[in-house]
């Protein structure tokens, strides 16, 4: 299973999945819809699944001498790892914004949603819905997205 996860991280993952982790820094932009960070992380994961489909990664992996359930577990573990990394980055930046930068005028007079614990909860809901709808739908067919 760990070798399949390494394969997902090194070969099957789209570079966008890693680049879009930097969008967690949007948490620090005042007056910006910060939930867009979660959207970009899900978009990067979608691109990884699409690239894997175009490269016949599922067929290649199914031909390897591994259990078929481990293939699904490794793909899902990759998805959860990227989402947890993004969530942790957002959590660190949110805590920094709530403590060290709480008195900054650009954050106190913010018309949009401030970075707080509710924001982190909505990110978790967004990632959970992505896993429930997209990832589950992908593994019903594995050759059709969603």
Region spans (language model):
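Hydrophobic alpha-helical transmembrane segments of membrane proteins
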Residues: 1-58, 74-146
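Alpha-helix N-cap/helix-start motif at helix boundaries, enriched for small hydrophobics
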Residues: 70-72
């Amino acid at each position: 299973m760990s070798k399949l996860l390494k394969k997902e991280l090194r070969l099957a993952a789209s570079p966008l999945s890693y680049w879009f982790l930097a969008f967690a820094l949007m948490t620090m932009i005042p007056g910006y819809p910060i939930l867009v960070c979660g959207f970009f992380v899900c978009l990067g994961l979608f691109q990884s699944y699409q690239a894997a489909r175009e490269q016949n990664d599922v067929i290649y992996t199914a031909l390897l001498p591994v259990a078929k359930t481990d293939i699904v577990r490794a793909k899902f573990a990759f998805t959860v790892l990227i989402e947890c990394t993004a969530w942790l980055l957002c959590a660190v930046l949110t805590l920094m914004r709530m403590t060290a930068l709480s008195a900054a005028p650009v954050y106190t007079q913010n018309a949009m949603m401030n970075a707080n614990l509710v924001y982190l909860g909505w990110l978790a809901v967004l990632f959970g819905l992505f896993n429930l709808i997209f990832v589950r739908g992908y593994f019903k067919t594995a050759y059709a997205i969603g």
